[in-house]
Amino acid sequence: MNRAEVQSWFKNYGSWVIAVFHLVGILLLGGPWSPDFVMLTPLNLLLLSVVYLITSDKVNRPLLYALPVLMGFLVEMLGTNTGFPFGEYSYSSVLGPGLLGTPFLIGVLWWVLLRSFNDVFSRISSNKTLISLATGLGMLLLDIFIEPVAIGLGFWEWQSAEVPLENYIAWFVLSFVFARLTMNGQVKNPMSKWVLIVQGGFFIVMGILRQ
């Protein structure tokens, strides 16, 4: 298969691929046996990222398109080493290798989610500021569902007993800023809505199962 055929296949079936892998993730991580399988999490996130990259339309400004990877990683590295702007927290080894206590995959996850929200809202409005605000709100809402599950699975831990309010404020503000700064690098991707549906569904279901 050539590149065009591979992209066509994933555009047609990529949503099923990521849905099946996340369903398997729920089965493996939703029970008492989850400690035996949680270290497979990076493979699932990597698959999600690769599928999203393959299904993206032609990228005319690749550096701007990929910039959220670096932005997300650097701000997380700042956060884990200084406590600013999210609060005092630290990552475990579950999300794979990293630098200065920050997994490399966390920057990739910022990119996938930010680009997905940006793409979805770009289909509704042409106002870049409104799109960026909606992206920030979407990222904030998703993080609310992610936090209890990620903490329970040992992805990261907070020094405080509860997730600090500044985490959510920073998540929204940074998502808005990153979306606005990189808006001109956005491209359409048929997988965007499925990334959000699957990721949202995964963390909602996992949150229910782990209560």
Language-model region placement:
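Aromatic-rich, lipid-facing transmembrane alpha helices and their immediate juxtamembrane interface loops
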Residues: M1-Q211
